């Protein structure tokens, strides 16, 4: 039996909507990365972009466990000497929760050129409203462990 290689025409993309209310950020990111890569499909191929579109709503209500709100820091650099700046996740979630969710998911995608294509299928929104109702997204439930 020969190995099946999917053709670009064989890719069937679906839309999923995930409610991030009280979901631990790491669990949300890992399951979203699986959907974006397409690893949940039986026709998965690591060299192709097989993933689905993912909409995440209520990003401002995502949860972090332990003392990560105060101790975990997000870093960025301006490109100039001495241009390293950092902010803790309590401030980041208050000012820009979309960035915190995108950063966590981006870290769980492969560090290849496919990651940019897969990340472009991610839509994150601060509140409960999103403009993708025409795509008829299916609700995806995150398997949650009691905190």
Swiss-Prot record:
Keywords: Ribonucleoprotein, Ribosomal protein. One of its GO terms (molecular function) is mRNA binding. The keyword Oxidoreductase does not apply. InterPro entries: Ribosomal_uL13, Ribosomal_uL13_bac-type, Ribosomal_uL13_sf. GO terms for biological process: negative regulation of translation; translation. GO terms for cellular component: cytosolic large ribosomal subunit. It holds the Pfam family Ribosomal_L13. It comes from the Bacteria. The keyword Ribosomal protein applies. Belongs to the universal ribosomal protein uL13 family. This protein is one of the early assembly proteins of the 50S ribosomal subunit, although it is not seen to bind rRNA by itself. It is important during the early stages of 50S assembly. Part of the 50S ribosomal subunit. NCBIfam families: rplM_bact (TIGR01066). PANTHER family: LARGE RIBOSOMAL SUBUNIT PROTEIN UL13M, RIBOSOMAL PROTEIN L13. This is Large ribosomal subunit protein uL13. It comes from Renibacterium salmoninarum (strain ATCC 33209 / DSM 20767 / JCM 11484 / NBRC 15589 / NCIMB 2235).
């Amino acid at each position: 039996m020969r190995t099946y290689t999917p053709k670009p025409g064989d890719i069937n993309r679906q839309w999923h909507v995930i409610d991030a209310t009280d979901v631990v950020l790491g669990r949300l990111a890992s399951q979203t990365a699986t959907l974006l890569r397409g690893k949940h499909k039986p026709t998965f191929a690591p060299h192709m972009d097989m993933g689905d579109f993912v909409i995440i709503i209520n990003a401002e209500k995502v949860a972090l466990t332990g003392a990560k709100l105060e101790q975990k820091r997000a870093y960025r650099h301006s490109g100039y000497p001495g241009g390293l700046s950092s902010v803790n996740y309590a401030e980041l979630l208050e000012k820009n929760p979309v960035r915190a969710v995108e950063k966590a998911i981006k870290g769980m995608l492969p560090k290849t050129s496919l990651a940019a294509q897969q990340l472009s299928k991610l839509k994150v929104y601060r509140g409960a409203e999103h403009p993708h109702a025409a795509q008829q997204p299916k609700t995806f439930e995150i398997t949650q462990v009691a905190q």
